[in-house]
């Protein structure tokens, strides 16, 4: 059996495919960035004004330097947005998405003041877990890879060496015993399930083995003739349709945290030694309660690891399992990249401080757990990278921001500037107004904008102020909503879409109206209390907020203030500097600024239409006993029927089974949308459409 041997990496060129060509400042920025990277500059800053196409510039830069790239972003929503943009620009290359797979995560903690221990509680998103596996799989099997990741990529991940050692290579014509392969799959943490075939499982029928790797949506079929692999194929797990024949494939483990029996037994011995050492320390300090607590918890974990190979909170023993020395850095996604990878930090003024803060935030919680006997000291080695450890693991770095921070500007030799927008749009005019009568003035400005079918953003300092202002504007007949951290994530996406569509005209917010919001319909951004110095009214925050009006031809920013603070002056001066450059460029080249037209395509709207069509179709389907529609489709047996559809393909599926499948996929579709996995939801929607077409054909033929 061929295991952790040489992996034949696919080497394909990065190629941007787009109807657009670099325009405005982009050609000069791409050339300058490429020259700096090729000359070996370690830190490069791209100061790119909002809306100048920094993402596209990055894609063209990757095409020029032809190196695997990690793009670090400040949050999941922007990561998804950026990954989609790169997938459109680099359709023939692997663009991966790597974020935390927790939908919900409550870390374990101990509050000494109230003697309260909080158990770890979490919920894992399976689709995000698949995408994480897809990212590591791509990094190990090809070079043309762009991974868009949040800061969670500096948290511990299993070692690449163990991950590769656990891999199995399937090669057509190779000698391999079927039973040995099945045992190997089990050791890789895949589960055999002949009835419910899904990601992370395999099934066996005679000499045919099928598996859906953790990182794939397609299944792999391996056909044996004796002890020889006769055929390898990829197929659609739902329909059974063969996608293509394969000569060679790699199957990686179902978990990044794979440890063989030898490694696990070594780890258990090390944990036992540390426990004995720590108990001695606690007892010498007369901390008998803490010693007893630690003995009970650790002994239980050790028994679970010996019997099951796993225990809750096993990540706290990761340094022992990895065989790392005390205090050494954990392995993480960065270790899966080749040595020459390029790092791009998006919105660096926010993301760089995030990276630096991760370690201390994690340590403050863990110290309490160790001091009070809930964890061994080695639990503190299950952590994100420290800032200096992060720097050791990265090579050349490009920082992207409209407002670069002092750190990146201090590291770089000057900066590359991208001020001109391809559309010719210029930065908005900034007007400072007195706070006296600011709400009445705001109301008048809103009415002027709504008459022109334009939208308004209003930014306040507190949630209370946002809600009170929303109530006041509603009372004066304004169509308005508010947006702050208490509004759930999916609702935020819906609010932004509804604002663009004109469902309402004004959106009131606090700190969410900054990086990454792309709203071409917004012609006015009003900043209340602009002279209140602080994080929300720093020069960086003000420039970012001003940028929200930079996508509209008639964009304006109104700052309500009784004095001009240093932050306001810096923001206004920088905006005026950029305006002057943009106006001069447009005049010289005879460019008339064009409105930015961006399609309002939102999956939530498409799902609503799909639901209406599904209800209309299934409403005509009789289940007996008066049950019609999608509720009937959820009756007992629907899932079993759905599994049968998967196994036998559509042609063999009776109408009732198809209906069950439609209902099940509809539920999955909404689940994916709720997790902001819009691409997944769209793919499931397409499957639902195909199944409904099949059902309609059966009805037309009189078979349903």
Curated annotation (Swiss-Prot):
- Kindly give the InterPro entries that the UniProt entry links to this protein: Helicase/UvrB_N, Helicase_ATP-bd, Helicase_C-like, P-loop_NTPase, UVR_dom, UVR_dom_sf, UvrB, UvrB_inter
Q: What highest taxon heads this organism's lineage?
A: Bacteria
Q: Name one Pfam family in it.
A: UVR
SMART domains in UniProt: DEXDc, HELICc
UniProt-annotated location(s): Cytoplasm
Which chain positions lie within coiled-coil regions?
none
- Which positions are annotated as binding ATP? 48-55
Q: What does UniProt give as GO cellular component? A: cytoplasm; excinuclease repair complex
Predominant subcellular localization, coarse grouping: cytoplasm
Q: For the motif Beta-hairpin, what are the positions?
A: 101-124
Q: Which UniProt keywords apply?
A: ATP-binding, Cytoplasm, DNA damage, DNA excision, DNA repair, Excision nuclease, Helicase, Hydrolase, Nucleotide-binding, SOS response
Q: Does the keyword Aminoacyl-tRNA synthetase apply?
A: no
**What residues does the Helicase C-terminal domain cover?**
438-604
GO molecular function terms attached to this record: ATP binding; ATP hydrolysis activity; DNA binding; excinuclease ABC activity; helicase activity
**Which residue numbers delimit the UVR domain?**
659-694
KW DNA damage (keyword) present:
yes
Q: Where is the signal peptide?
A: none
CDD domains per UniProt: DEXHc_UvrB (cd17916), SF2_C_UvrB (cd18790)
Purpose: The UvrABC repair system catalyzes the recognition and processing of DNA lesions. A damage recognition complex composed of 2 UvrA and 2 UvrB subunits scans DNA for abnormalities. Upon binding of the UvrA(2)B(2) complex to a putative damaged site, the DNA wraps around one UvrB monomer. DNA wrap is dependent on ATP binding by UvrB and probably causes local melting of the DNA helix, facilitating insertion of UvrB beta-hairpin between the DNA strands. Then UvrB probes one DNA strand for the presence of a lesion.
Which NCBIfam families would you find in this protein's record? PRK05298.1, uvrb
* Comment field on protein domains: The beta-hairpin motif is involved in DNA binding.
Query: Which PANTHER family does the UniProt record give?
Result: UVRABC SYSTEM PROTEIN B (PTHR24029:SF0)
Q: How does it assemble?
A: Forms a heterotetramer with UvrA during the search for lesions. Interacts with UvrC in an incision complex.
Q: Which family does it belong to?
A: Belongs to the UvrB family.
Q: Tell me what this protein is called.
A: UvrABC system protein B
Q: Which organism is it from?
A: Pseudarthrobacter chlorophenolicus (strain ATCC 700700 / DSM 12829 / CIP 107037 / JCM 12360 / KCTC 9906 / NCIMB 13794 / A6) (Arthrobacter chlorophenolicus)
> What's the source species' lineage?
Bacteria, Bacillati, Actinomycetota, Actinomycetes, Micrococcales
């Amino acid at each position: 059996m061929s295991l952790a041997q040489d992996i034949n990496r696919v080497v394909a060129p990065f190629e941007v495919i787009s109807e657009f060509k670099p325009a405005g400042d982009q050609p000069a920025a791409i050339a300058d960035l490429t020259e700096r990277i090729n000359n070996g500059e370690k830190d490069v800053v791209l100061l790119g004004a909002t809306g100048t196409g920094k993402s596209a510039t990055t894609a063209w830069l990757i095409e020029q330097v032809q190196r695997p790239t990690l793009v670090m972003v400040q949050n999941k929503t922007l990561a998804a947005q950026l990954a989609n943009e790169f997938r459109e620009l680099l359709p023939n290359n692997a663009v991966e998405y790597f974020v935390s797979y927790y939908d919900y995560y409550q870390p374990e903690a101990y509050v000494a003041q109230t003697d309260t221990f909080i158990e770890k509680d979490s919920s894992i998103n399976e689709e995000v877990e698949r995408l994480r596996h897809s990212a590591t799989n791509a990094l190990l099997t090809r070079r043309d890879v762009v991974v868009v990741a949040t800061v969670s990529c500096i948290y511990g991940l299993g070692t690449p060496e163990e991950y590769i050692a656990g891999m199995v290579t399937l090669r057509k014509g190779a000698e391999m015993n079927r039973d040995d392969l099945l045992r190997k799959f089990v050791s890789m943490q895949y589960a055999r399930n002949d009835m419910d075939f899904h990601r992370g499982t395999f099934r066996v029928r005679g000499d045919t083995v099928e598996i859906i790797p953790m990182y794939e949506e397609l299944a792999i079929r391996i056909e044996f003739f004796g002890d020889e692999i006769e055929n390898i194929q990829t197929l659609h797990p739902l329909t059974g349709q063969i996608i293509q024949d394969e000569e060679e494939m790699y199957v990686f483990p179902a978990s990044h945290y794979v440890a063989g029996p030898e490694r696990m037994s070594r780890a258990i011995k090390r944990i036992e030694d540390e426990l004995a050492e720590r108990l001695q320390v606690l007892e010498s300090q007369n901390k008998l309660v803490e010693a007893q607590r630690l003995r009970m918890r650790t002994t239980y974990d050790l028994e679970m690891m010996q019997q099951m190979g796993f225990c809750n909170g096993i990540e706290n023993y990761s340094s022992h399992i990895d065989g790392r020395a005390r205090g050494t850095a954990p392995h993480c996604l960065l270790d899966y990249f080749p040595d020459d990878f390029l790092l791009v930090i998006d919105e660096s003024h926010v993301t760089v401080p995030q990276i630096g803060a991760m370690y201390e935030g994690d340590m403050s919680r863990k110290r309490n757990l160790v001091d009070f006997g809930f964890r061994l000291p080695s639990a503190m080695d299950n952590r994100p990278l420290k800032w200096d450890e992060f720097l050791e693991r990265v090579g050349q770095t490009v920082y992207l921001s409209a407002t670069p921070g002092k750190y990146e500007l201090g590291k770089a030799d000057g900066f590359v500037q991208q001020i001109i927008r391809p559309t010719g749009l210029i930065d908005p005019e900034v007007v400072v107004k007195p706070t006296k009568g600011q709400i009445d003035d705001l109301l008048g400005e809103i009415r002027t904008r709504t008459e022109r079918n334009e939208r308004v953003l209003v930014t306040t300092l507190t949630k209370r102020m946002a809600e009170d202002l929303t109530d006041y504007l509603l009372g004066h007949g304004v169509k308005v909503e508010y947006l702050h951290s208490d509004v759930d994530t999916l609702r935020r996406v819906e609010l932004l879409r509804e604002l663009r569509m004109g469902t309402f005209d004004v959106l009131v917010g606090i700190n969410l109206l900054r990086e990454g919001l792309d709203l071409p319909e917004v012609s006015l951004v009003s900043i209340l209390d602009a002279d209140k110095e602080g994080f929300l009214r720093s020069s960086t925050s003000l420039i970012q907020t001003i940028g929200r009006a930079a996508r509209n031809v008639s964009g304006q920013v109104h700052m309500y203030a009784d004095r001009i603070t240093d932050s306001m002056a810096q923001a206004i001066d920088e905006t005026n500097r950029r305006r002057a450059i943009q106006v001069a460029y447009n005049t010289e080249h005879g460019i008339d600024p064009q409105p930015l037209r961006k399609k309002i395509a939102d999956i939530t709207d498409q799902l609503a239409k799909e639901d209406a069509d599904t209800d209309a179709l299934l409403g005509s389907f009789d289940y007996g006993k008066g049950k019609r529609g999608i509720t009937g489709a959820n009756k007992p047996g629907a899932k079993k029927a759905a599994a049968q559809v998967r196994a036998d393909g559509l042609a063999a599926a009776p109408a009732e089974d198809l209906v069950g499948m439609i209902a099940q996929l509809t539920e999955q579709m909404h689940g994916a949308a709720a997790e902001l996995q819009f691409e997944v939801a769209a793919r499931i929607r397409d499957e639902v459409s195909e199944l409904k077409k099949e059902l309609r054909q059966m009805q037309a033929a009189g078979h349903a």
